[in-house]
């Protein structure tokens, strides 16, 4: 009878060891996945911001070159639309480009009714104030809240102080 009791204890101890090892493996995997996901999210966010800045700078150059070629200080809505309407981040449907003059008035927006209206974006209104105070802020990518929606914006200040903005949710 004692022989059975010893085998039962050994079996119980082996089962406990296996359970502890399995639990340790599961916990280790969960932590590893959490760290990998956190790092991946950071990399994706960084990549999107870099892409947005590249798009803003490219849009700036497109508009500057068109104005220089046509020898004009500003273009028509149709000319801006021709240059900017298809500028979007691939697979990000909420992304678009708009253009604001140094007074904060929309020169181009995919929603044409917004053209001629004051810009509503707090980041851009802040840039307008800085420009009006004689400051020349550097190009940047920022995140902000717009009517309860988290958004990203990359902006470039053009040579005539117009502001090119790439926006995305």
Where are these regions (language model features)?
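Short, hydrophobic beta-strand elements of compact beta-sandwich sensory domains
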Residues: 55, 152-169
């Amino acid at each position: 009878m004692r022989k059975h009791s010893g085998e039962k204890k050994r079996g119980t101890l082996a089962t406990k060891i296996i359970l502890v090892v399995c639990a340790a493996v599961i916990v280790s995997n969960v932590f590893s996945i959490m760290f990998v996901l956190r790092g991946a999210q950071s990399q994706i966010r960084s990549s999107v911001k870099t892409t947005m800045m590249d798009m803003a700078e490219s849009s700036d150059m497109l508009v500057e070159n068109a104005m220089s070629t046509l020898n004009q200080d500003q273009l028509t809505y149709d000319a801006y639309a021709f240059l900017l309407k298809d500028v979007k981040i691939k697979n990000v449907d909420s992304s678009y480009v708009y253009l604001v003059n140094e007074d904060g008035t929309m020169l181009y927006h995919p929603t044409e009714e917004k053209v001629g209206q004051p810009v509503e974006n707090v980041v851009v209104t802040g840039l307008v104030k800085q420009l009006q105070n004689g400051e020349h802020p550097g190009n940047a990518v920022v995140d902000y809240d717009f009517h309860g929606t988290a958004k990203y914006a990359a902006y470039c200040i053009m040579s005539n102080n117009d502001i090119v903005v790439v926006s995305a949710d």
